A protein has these predicted regions:
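Short aromatic/hydrophobic contact patches that present stacked aromatics
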Residues: 143, 377, 410
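Generic "edge-of-domain/loop-turn" microfeature
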Residues: 38, 151, 185, 304, ...
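Gly/Gly-Pro- and Ser/Thr-rich, intrinsically disordered tail segments characteristic of DNA damage-repair
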Residues: 1-276, 282-286, 433-435, 440-491
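DNA-contacting surface of Y-family translesion DNA polymerases
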Residues: 7, 227, 237-406, 426
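A glycine-rich phosphate-binding loop feature that marks nucleotide/adenosyl-phosphate handling sites
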Residues: 182-185, 276-278, 335-347, 405-418, ...
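Short, charged/polar surface micro-motifs in flexible loops or helix N-caps
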Residues: 11-13, 37-41, 345-350, 416-420
Length: 491
């Protein structure tokens, strides 16, 4: 029996939520979601569809939005009566008047609000399908195995998708794009690529469909290849070096044993995924995704600093991150035996011309010093705040260039396991003839007291909020924990 999968993506979700909250039409309002208090370099979390139509990227920085709007208004001014604007408006339809100046709303991010609306929409989906047949891919995107529901509702895949989307629109005012396919890959590609090139209906809804044959006929020659799910810039660059630019190219290579060997040399096991996707094949189903557990678990804490930070302030912020990471481990009942740290430097580090080390290009093509990266083993699995902070600080001091300005921090606890799964060999401590039993006992007592303190802090934080109990360091000038504790996802 042929399967039917549906992928649904809420259109410019954050921006749509902000428009609906203001009783504005999300498809007819120029709005950007960004935190103006973080300077004009802040990344926009969402841009409304109408504002995107002026050539603004969905992930632009605020200053890029400002510059583009200024440019658009300069062009509009040339066509305005007497070269003067009579009014300005953030309503897209009003811009049909040549005397109207383009305006837009800057909405401060409300992550808690977006999560609540996302949960409400998920509840709408559950009116139609069982939880076992739906997978939440992100806050605004889901996969649904619709196979068993088409007969129940007497619809095809397109009709099923439309039924759900219209209910969401009626209930929340938010519209969506959907893809329908015979597997999870094809429905995702139908949504990401095909739906973008078809006209929207009267509700702004776009629904595209793909099966394996249609995929080959319409998308084997599609460029850029990065439009396809799971093909990033790095993969595309390596493919280009082999002379591969399209999914059709990959499928042709897969028919030649020699060329397959070349692919395996570059991509290893991922070659199988590339070839499957080139042919429109995806054997993974929703139950497989839900039951997957990575073999090597880790837990990370990352932070993009609001401004370039010197050594002292970066060290302070990292201390807070290590402190919070250890509490997170205790809260989850897990332990780690390895810390990995990455420090990304800011482009301003090159301003004085004194840096002589390796230079790389960041995501935006700007030259920056190569990041610092290091690993430090803890000796045994632990969630001790003292141990994790001390190890993190020592690792930081070992890898950092104190003359450079930091902009990104990523701290990872690796080889994470449950406390009850700690190997027996780690539970015993070998004491030599020269060790003092009292010292060993004192260390154990210190860890027991520390654990009691950690659990007490977590109890207070869960009951009264993350900022209900803090350490003196968190009140030091330049610390960020108090602000981050009041935000979700950094906003």
């Amino acid at each position: 029996m042929e399967k039917t999968y549906v992928a649904i993506d809420l259109k410019s979700f954050y921006a749509s939520v902000e428009c609906v909250e203001r009783q504005l039409d999300p498809l007819n309002t120029n709005l950007v979601v960004a935190d103006e208090s973080r300077t004009e370099k802040t990344i926009c979390l969402a841009v409304s569809p109408s504002l995107k139509s002026f050539g603004i990227s969905g992930r632009a920085r605020l200053f890029e939005v400002i510059q583009r709007v200024e440019q658009v208004n300069k062009e509009r001014l040339q066509k305005a009566p007497k070269r003067q604007f009579a009014k300005k408006s953030y309503i897209y339809s009003e811009l049909s008047d040549p005397a109207c100046e383009l305006d837009y709303i800057v909405a401060t991010p409300q992550m808690a609000k977006y999560l609540a609306v996302s949960a409400k929409i998920y509840g709408i989906y559950l009116k139609y399908v069982s939880p076992e047949d739906i997978f939440a891919y992100s806050i605004d995107e889901v996969f649904i195995d619709a196979t068993g529901y088409l007969g129940l509702y007497n619809v095809d895949g397109r009709g099923f998708a439309q039924m759900l989307i219209l209910d969401v629109l009626k209930t929340t005012g938010i519209t969506a794009t959907a893809g329908v396919g015979t597997n999870m890959y094809l429905c995702k590609v139908a949504m990401d690529i095909v739906a973008k090139h078809i006209p929207a209906d009267k509700n702004g809804v776009r629904i595209a469909e793909l099966n394996e044959q249609l995929y080959k006929e319409t998308l084997w020659g599609h460029t850029p290849i990065t439009d396809f799910w799971r093909v990033g810039a790095g993969t595309a660059s390596r493919l280009e070096k082999l002379g591969i630019y399209t999914m059709g190219d990959i499928s042709r290579w897969s028919l030649d044993h020699y060329l397959i060997g070349k692919l395996y040399k570059v991509f290893g096991k991922n070659t199988e995924l590339l070839i499957d996707h080139a042919w429109g094949i995806e054997p993974t189903a929703i139950p497989d995704v839900k039951s997957y557990r990575p073999s090597n678990n880790s837990i990370s804490s990352g932070q993009v600093l609001q401004e370039p930070c010197n050594y002292e302030r970066t060290r302070l912020i990292l201390w807070e991150m290590a402190d919070m990471l250890s509490l997170d481990l205790v809260d989850k009942g897990i332990v780690t035996n390895q810390i990995v740290l990455t420090v990304g430097y800011d482009k301003e580090s090159l301003a004085d011309g004194h840096y002589t080390g390796e230079v790389v290009c960041d995501h935006y093509g700007r030259k920056i010093p190569k990041h610092a990266h290091g690993t430090q083993n803890l000796g045994r699995h632990t969630s001790s705040t003292r141990k994790i902070i001390d190890t993190t600080m020592a690792l930081f001091d070992r890898i950092i260039d104190k003359t450079l300005l930091a902009r990104r921090l990523n701290l990872t606890a690796c080889n994470v396991i449950r406390e009850e799964d700690i190997p027996e060999v780690e539970s015993y401590e070998q004491i030599s003839l020269f060790d003092m039993a009292e010292a060993a006992n004192a260390d154990n007592n210190a860890e027991e007291k520390e654990r009691a303190l950690q659990e007490a802090m977590l109890l207070i934080k869960h009951k009264y909020g993350k900022n209900a109990i803090l350490k003196g360091t968190n009140y030091t000038e330049g610390a960020t924990a108090r602000v981050r504790n009041r935000s979700i996802g950094g906003h």
